[in-house]
């Protein structure tokens, strides 16, 4: 081969010489694996907008994008016409930290590292993962948000918000929290835990997507995480099982409702019908029977 010279030797001396040459060439060094230089680049907000395929008669416009917001998980307009956005910072951080440590060894690993992350990286990811709520402003009236104020920070990972009681209720990984700005300085100085005790193992499998119902309850997707929750206004623990659930905005009540396992997203019609989507299927599910009827029949299997 061009660039190589044949070396004739034998025995142990030849083996040692061959290994030495390989080491000098860097072929056996455990060097850190570098990211691919030709990895696809993310689309710009404008390019992403052009990729949407809309049904006839529908229109879509860009209202806010990076760097104004980052990793948004929910939006809500309140009664004053203000737009709030909640964010989650640290999604799949355990996998990222695990990959960093793995790359230092120079070994190639084809496992899905988020699933096989070590207890150490999981613990470190929990420390660094947090949620945030921003208040967006359109200062020039062009329909595009051009200013973002941090309204509430240092929250657990946030998975949805809904306006209530003059403020915002945010759905986080472990608890449901009411936030409000009582002084008008643009910061939420009131932070009240309504319900606590929700579980989260993998970060995307947490309670999410709160929606007001016509019955003045707030409905939440349960995401297949069992929970026995407490709250300052509750008389005792409430077992939600692995169901979707609904709660009162003042924290006075919370109860399970009919819902599929692994629910990530829901919507309610004007007549009160609830539709779900699950990670296990592309289909939308309708919920025709109330939980109280299904739960009282021991011969009917129901989620949760």
Q: What residue ranges belong to the model's regions?
A:
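N-terminal secretory signal peptides that target proteins for export/translocation
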Residues: 1-9
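Beta-propeller blade termini and top-face loops
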Residues: 26-304
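Bacterial N-terminal signal peptides
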Residues: 10-26
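Short, internal active-site loops enriched in acidic
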Residues: 8-11, 157
């Amino acid at each position: 081969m061009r660039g190589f010279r044949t070396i004739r030797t034998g025995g142990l001396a030849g083996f040692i010489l061959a290994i030495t040459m390989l080491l000098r060439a860097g072929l056996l060094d455990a060097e850190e694996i570098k990211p691919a230089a030709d990895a696809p680049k993310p689309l710009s907000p404008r390019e992403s907008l052009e990729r949407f395929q809309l049904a006839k008669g529908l229109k879509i416009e860009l209202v806010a994008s990076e760097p104004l917001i980052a990793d948004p998980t929910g939006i809500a307009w309140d009664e004053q016409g203000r737009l709030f956005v909640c964010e989650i910072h640290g999604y799949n951080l355990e996998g990222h930290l695990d990959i960093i440590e793995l790359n230092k060894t120079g070994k190639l690993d084809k496992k899905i590292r988020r699933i096989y992350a070590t207890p150490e990286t999981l613990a470190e990811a929990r420390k660094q993962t947090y949620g945030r709520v921003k208040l967006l402003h359109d200062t020039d009236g062009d329909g595009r948000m051009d200013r973002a104020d941090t309204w509430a920070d240092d929250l657990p990972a946030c998975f949805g918000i809904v306006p209530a009681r003059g403020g915002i209720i945010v759905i986080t990984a472990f608890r449901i929290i009411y936030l409000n700005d009582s002084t008008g300085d643009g910061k939420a100085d009131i932070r009240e835990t309504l319900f606590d005790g929700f579980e989260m193992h993998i970060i995307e499998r947490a309670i999410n997507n709160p929606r007001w119902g016509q019955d003045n309850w707030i409905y939440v997707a349960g995401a297949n995480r069992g929970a026995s929750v407490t709250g300052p206004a509750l008389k005792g623990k409430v077992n939600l099982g692995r169901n979707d659930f609904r709660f009162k905005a003042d924290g006075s009540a919370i109860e399970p409702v009919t819902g599929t396992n692994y629910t990530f997203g829901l919507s309610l019609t004007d007549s009160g019908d609830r539709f779900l989507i699950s990670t296990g299927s592309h289909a939308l599910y309708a919920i025709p029977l109330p939980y109280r009827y299904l739960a009282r029949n021991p011969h009917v299997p129901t989620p949760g």
